[in-house]
Amino acid sequence: MITNSLDPVISIGTLAKKVGLSVSAIRKYEEQGLLISHRTYSGHRLFSYEDIERVRSIQHLIKELGFNFEGIRRMQAILPCWDLLPCEKKVQENCLAYNGTSKPCWMIKEAHCTLKGNECRKCLVYRFGSLLTEDIKDLIHKERYETDQRSRIKQLLNET
């Protein structure tokens, strides 16, 4: 039987063993908004194979790069979800995820995409946000640089 990497098939205990953490540490990651579990009807947490890499990435940020939970959350909060999941300008202006800097979009229950019924566990922003956090600076710098360059070129063309 082949399973999708997003299918919730791993118990919290199995996940903890695979990544070398305690069950309480996995719960703490979830409590801090760094990990989203799937809940069964009986309330048991299940995780996907992708969550194994997500937890390993979080461990790397904490142990090797010296981040704390708040630092990781704030870094994930600046992920440009509006570029990955384009939404209308009017929606962006009123979106708490777009305007906020302290929580990633999947922690904001009033985010526009959540209200539309999107499941954060399966969302591109959440799925790759944890894995890309080390490259956020490059992503944002490149975007800003290209935007500044385009603006500067337009300005120069208008002056001639």
Residue ranges with predicted function:
Residues Q32-G33, G43:
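Flexible, glycine-biased helix-capping/connector loops in cytosolic signal-transduction modules
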Residues I26, H38-L46:
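A short, glycine- and basic residue-enriched loop/turn
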Residues I2-I12, K17-K18, I36-R39, Y49-T160:
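Arg/Lys-rich, alpha-helical DNA-contact motif
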Residues K17, E30-E31:
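Alpha-helical residues within the helix-turn-helix
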Residues V19-A25:
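Short coil turns linking two alpha-helices in DNA-binding domains
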